[in-house]
Amino acid sequence: MRKKILATTAMAAAAVLGLSACSGGDDATAEGSGELQIEVPDIAMQEELGDYEGEVNIVAWSGFVEAEWSDAFTDETGCVVNRRVAGTSDEMVQLMRTGDYDLVSASGDASLRLIAGGDVQPLNLELIPNFGDDIVEGMKGQIYDTINGKSYGIPIGRGANILQYNSEIVTEEPTSWDVAWEKDSPYAGQVIAYDAPIYIADAAVYLMAHEPELGIENPYALDEKQLAAAIDLLKQQNEIVSEYWSDPAAQITSFAGGTTVLGTSWEVLRKLTEDDKFKSVLPEEGSTGWSDAWMLATESKNPNCAYAWMDYASTPEVNGAIAMNFGMAPANAAFCETSEEAKAHCDYFHATDEEYFEKVWFWTTPIEQCIDGRSAEEATCTNFQQWTDAWLSVKG
């Protein structure tokens, strides 16, 4: 089964602590501008392509690199694709630091760690012609992979963390996350929640709508007071939660077996239940979500094959094949027009519905620089280590 589990280890936390604010924090902007200014290693961008080296070594989520399309890539380029499947973002970060891999399909909770650690290099988009107009705008220049005006990631796909429910018990579609957060929920004791420090952001999204006096503008930019409020809410939720999940298979089993009535999910997990009684909704408060991108190792031994792969994997056909195999919205919107099956997939995962994804706050590693626009003089935000420590207190 597919996993995207934010790691909680000290190594991951230490990596994030390397992210520090530049002077002039007023230059930092929020989601999607590509104007976040932080201190990162000054790594040169590749200027032109050379001869293919004969192989490319990729760390990827299960389902992203399969023989169905990688064999054709090898036939076209002579670059043999060597795949290593990773189960967590932390594992991906650690593997990329071994120097053995050229590419990684990083999620937003790993990308800033890799950029700040000097593990990945900025990309020359002119060498990736398929990164063009057909790539959905909502996946270009995002804060989690575009730093100081430089692009570090080529988008693959995205998804929202939605509210899933058993419609035989929850007979009216919920409009709010309150049924999963408030202690007077009629479904107390039958609620499932995600098990990772990044889930703190879900609490922050809820607080943005219900306690605006806290001043939360970005769920990944929490000062100490705001983090404390999120933890208080999570501890309240803990009293009504029957189960936490990090293994997607366990989440599906919990719903199918009747232990869980509602809670956090992904659209693909609802689909995999193969039971129409399970419905999903993106509540009025919005939600968190995830977005994956190809990132190139700074010390890549096979950069030309790696660039060729990023371009190849960005074609409508291959990007769409990855999206369908994994269960997510593709980055290349042109895929949606290739067949009726493709259109149905895109409709199911809201591939080109930017109004839908405008309500989604994609996973971003929390850092001390407040990425909501507050300057260093105005506030210091909490980092990943602090989130990790705080999360450990939630479940007791």
What are the functions of these language-model segments?
Residues 129-133, 231-237, 275-298:
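Periplasmic-binding protein-like
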Residues 16-21:
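C-terminal motif of bacterial Sec signal peptides marking the signal peptidase cleavage site
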Residues 164-169, 205-207, 290-302, 321-325:
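A bilobed periplasmic-binding-protein/Venus flytrap-type ligand-binding module shared by bacterial periplasmic
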Residues 22, 34-114:
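Early extracytoplasmic/lumenal segment of secretory-pathway proteins
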Residues 359-396:
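Conserved C-terminal helix/tail region of periplasmic/extracytoplasmic solute-binding proteins
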Residues 64-66, 105-254:
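Extracytoplasmic ligand-binding site segments that recognize negatively charged/polar headgroups
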Residues 297-366:
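Mature extracytoplasmic/periplasmic domains
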